[in-house]
């Protein structure tokens, strides 16, 4: 596997830390050891997160190509767009963000706080759009790029989740390399890796990275899209492309994509009771915050799997904490009583 041939622009502090979730593990019976790799604190750029890791492999193209405006898209409380705005500010570029109405959640402050507030503070041109949720290429995003061109700018396209970019999966191939180095220091290997999966490139890159040591099917994606067949197909497609790019040396097949579909309901961006219980439990036992859209759902999945005995006794499970905490402010009503 060859990742070194790709240019990388450092945006993170270095390897994100791996920390034990001792109290959560004990609360769940102590038969499974839980750990977290903290992508939620991987960078000093506006709280960082998994997209910051991905952008390290997209930014060189933007710089080398003389682009002056980063153009991206997400929901109103998109973590992606906040991280793109931060990177644009860091690089001295302009930023245009399309924020679509992906979540059926009504709150007077939803489009004024959290991620979107930070993007505005960082100087991004934020454009609200009424279109609903989907994980594909969006007309509103294409229009934003055309607008930049018409005004004399040179737009660099960054799709939702970085996922449709050919290099969108590279950052999480590197994640797997980091984990292997950290495993040497820890003196053991993780039996399973749990990750939230929506637009696909985080899961796909991780799958390819761990396929290098035979653990592709030990990467358990927790669907949060509530459109699992679209997500599954996108993970597979991105993983196959990424495997070729890094010269993995073997084909990625549909059997390599493990996607648990039990925890996304009722729909994208809306938590269920299990999501909220997982958010509170992890916060109160570990002081680790997760959000209702992504990490609360993957945390719910991991907790439920431990409770159900789905991990063999003695397993060491790594939870990939991808970020997302700034969105909590937009859901403050749900937590008004704690």
Curated annotation (Swiss-Prot):
InterPro entries: ACCD_DCysDesulf, ACP_carboxylate_deaminase, ACP_carboxylate_deaminase_bac, TrpB-like_PALP, TrpB-like_PALP_sf
Assigned keywords, A-Z: Hydrolase, Pyridoxal phosphate
GO molecular function, one term: pyridoxal phosphate binding
Cofactor dependence: pyridoxal 5'-phosphate
Enzyme Commission no: 3.5.99.7
Positions annotated as active site in the UniProt record: 78
Gene Ontology annotations of biological process type: 1-aminocyclopropane-1-carboxylate metabolic process; amine catabolic process
Modified residues (N6-(pyridoxal phosphate)lysine): 51
Class of this enzyme: hydrolase
CDD domains on file: ACCD
Catalytic reaction list: 1-aminocyclopropane-1-carboxylate + H2O = 2-oxobutanoate + NH4(+)
Domain of life according to the entry: Bacteria
Functional description taken from the UniProt entry: Catalyzes a cyclopropane ring-opening reaction, the irreversible conversion of 1-aminocyclopropane-1-carboxylate (ACC) to ammonia and alpha-ketobutyrate. Allows growth on ACC as a nitrogen source.
Family (UniProt): Belongs to the ACC deaminase/D-cysteine desulfhydrase family.
Quaternary structure note: Homotrimer.
Protein name: 1-aminocyclopropane-1-carboxylate deaminase
């Amino acid at each position: 596997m060859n990742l070194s041939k790709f240019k990388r622009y450092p945006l993170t502090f270095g390897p994100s830390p791996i920390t034990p979730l001792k109290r959560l593990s004990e609360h769940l019976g102590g038969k499974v050891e839980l750990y977290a790799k903290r992508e939620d604190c991987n960078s000093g750029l506006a709280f960082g997160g998994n997209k910051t890791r991905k952008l390290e492999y997209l930014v060189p193209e933007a710089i080398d190509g003389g682009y002056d405006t980063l153009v991206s898209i997400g929901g109103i409380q998109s973590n992606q767009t906040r991280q793109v705005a931060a990177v644009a500010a860091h690089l001295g570029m302009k930023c245009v963000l399309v924020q679509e109405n992906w979540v059926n959640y009504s709150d007077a402050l939803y489009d004024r706080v959290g991620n979107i507030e930070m993007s505005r503070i960082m100087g991004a041109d934020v454009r609200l759009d009424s279109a609903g949720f989907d994980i594909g290429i969006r007309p509103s995003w294409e229009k934003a790029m055309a607008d930049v061109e018409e005004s004399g700018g040179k737009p660099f396209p960054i799709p939702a989740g970085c996922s449709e970019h050919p290099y969108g999966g590279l950052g999480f191939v590197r994640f797997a390399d980091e984990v292997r180095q950290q495993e040497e220091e820890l003196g053991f290997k993780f039996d399973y890796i749990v990750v939230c999966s929506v637009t696909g490139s985080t899961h796909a890159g991780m799958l390819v990275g761990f396929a290098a040591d035979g653990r592709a099917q030990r990467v358990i994606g927790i669907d949060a899209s509530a459109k699992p067949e679209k997500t599954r197909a996108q993970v597979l497609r991105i993983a196959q492309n990424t495997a070729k790019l890094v010269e993995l040396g073997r084909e990625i097949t549909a059997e390599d994509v493990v996607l648990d579909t039990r925890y996304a309901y009722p729909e994208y961006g809306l938590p269920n009771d299990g999501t909220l219980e997982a958010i509170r439990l992890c916060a109160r036992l570990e002081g680790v915050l997760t959000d209702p859209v992504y990490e609360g759902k993957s945390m719910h999945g991991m907790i439920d799997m431990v409770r159900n005995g789905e991990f063999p006794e003695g397993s060491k499970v790594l939870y990939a904490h991808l970020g997302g905490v700034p969105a909590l402010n937009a859901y403050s009503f749900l937590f008004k009583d704690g």
